[in-house]
Amino acid sequence: MSSGFLARASASRYSVTAMDEKEFQKRCDVAFEALRRRLQEAGDVHGFEVEGGSGKLEVLFEDADETRFVISPNTPVRQIWISALTTSFKLSWSDAAGAFVLEKTGETLMELMGRILTEQLGSPVTV
């Protein structure tokens, strides 16, 4: 296996796929661009801001706590990490899903973002 990252079966509907750094970066760039566009569209409807730069995305909420979600790649382990709702979500690539997935639940990046935005805002959000 390349990069020491092993593909393994999980309890979710998908298994993760090993990849080298170049392939990870390519897939991550595509996923981040799609996520940025979809978050901006959702933000226009639901009243949150999306900022990007330095290889990460931030979702900013206009609440008393100035809550923010941070989405960033973690290249050494070939994962996308999301810090939100006092939790760190770690998503790995799945060829079967054609997306980064949270192994624990089987949610794709877009599905997970929709769920945690819905939890934060208290109304349904689709990403």
Question: How would you name each of these model-derived features?
Answer:
Residues 1-18:
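N-terminal mitochondrial targeting presequence
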